[in-house]
Amino acid sequence: MIEKIWSGESPLWRLLLPLSWLYGLVSGAIRLCYKLKLKRAWRAPVPVVVVGNLTAGGNGKTPVVVWLVEQLQQRGIRVGVVSRGYGGKAESYPLLLSADTTTAQAGDEPVLIYQRTDAPVAVSPVRSDAVKAILAQHPDVQIIVTDDGLQHYRLARDVEIVVIDGVRRFGNGWWLPAGPMRERAGRLKSVDAVIVNGGVPRSGEIPMHLLPGQAVNLRTGTRCDVAQLEHVVAMAGIGHPPRFFATLKMCGVQPEKCVPLADHQSLNHADVSALVSAGQTLVMTEKDAVKCRAFAEENWWYLPVDAQLSGDEPAKLLTQLTSLASGN
């Protein structure tokens, strides 16, 4: 229902306009206060890069963060990552992730990013505290990448990158809750790079596609072509589950059942195992896998995806960030 409201297919969005106007006024006032320096943002002693979005829901932001961190690491840059830690609840903040940190403590995306990149990752509702925690433990870090937080103006940033779903784009264009917008589309004029996940990019936008890798068994780590798996039940607890189901079909998999779950939904063995019957194979997203690995069964697999950016702009962006991190 919410997708129909946000896309404008349902007339119910008009009923929510008063709340959207209120949301827009408050969010605009907050940004203006920081812009006019009525409120002071905290500036880190190293450059900060924000990877965020203008809309609620999954846009492919986390794969972009992983891509960015890995690309900078390959260039010899030491990177730290901070996040709000949505879906997690730590005993205290800031929380610096370790091999023992669970998604219940830190949230799905931070654990995924930590496991993928081995970069220092910290979470806190106050992102400046997360930055301070990383720099205290890892003083060699040269640049901070923040996963989400475009609207978290308390943390000063040097570079802003926005990720857009190229198919859904901005829906009906309205602020939450009548539409999907956290900020209006005009905000794109002030960011440094716009990355478009799928669809047809517009002038000045960087095209991106999510490339699936081999399926990975949660228990054994065995890899295989996902099309070799039989009697597949697909599960996705991400911002936009249909994207994952479409990826499976693109890989030649015709799931016997597709199970969309809420983003950041907590998972347990009983609930997940109930999704599959004898002889079926469960295939989930990598984001779900970080929550299920501790209690996984032998017929549970996940499909990792990697961001692939096209054109000349990604190289220019990486050159800019490398120069910033190197102090040039």
From Swiss-Prot:
Top EC class, one word: transferase
Reaction it catalyzes: a lipid A disaccharide + ATP = a lipid IVA + ADP + H(+)
A Gene Ontology BP annotation from the UniProt entry: lipopolysaccharide core region biosynthetic process
GO cellular component, one term: plasma membrane
A GO molecular-function annotation: tetraacyldisaccharide 4'-kinase activity
Binding site for ATP: 55-62
The keyword Membrane is annotated on this UniProt entry: no
Enzyme Commission code: 2.7.1.130
Pathway(s) per entry: Glycolipid biosynthesis; lipid IV(A) biosynthesis; lipid IV(A) from (3R)-3-hydroxytetradecanoyl-[acyl-carrier-protein] and UDP-N-acetyl-alpha-D-glucosamine: step 6/6
Any single Pfam family the record assigns to this protein: LpxK
Record's keyword terms, sorted: ATP-binding, Kinase, Lipid A biosynthesis, Lipid biosynthesis, Lipid metabolism, Nucleotide-binding, Transferase
Matches recorded under NCBIfam families: lpxK
Family statement drawn from the similarity comment of this UniProt entry: Belongs to the LpxK family.
Function as written in the Swiss-Prot or TrEMBL entry: Transfers the gamma-phosphate of ATP to the 4'-position of a tetraacyldisaccharide 1-phosphate intermediate (termed DS-1-P) to form tetraacyldisaccharide 1,4'-bis-phosphate (lipid IVA).
PANTHER family for the chain: TETRAACYLDISACCHARIDE 4'-KINASE, TETRAACYLDISACCHARIDE 4'-KINASE, MITOCHONDRIAL-RELATED
Name of the featured protein: Tetraacyldisaccharide 4'-kinase
Gene giving rise to this polypeptide: lpxK
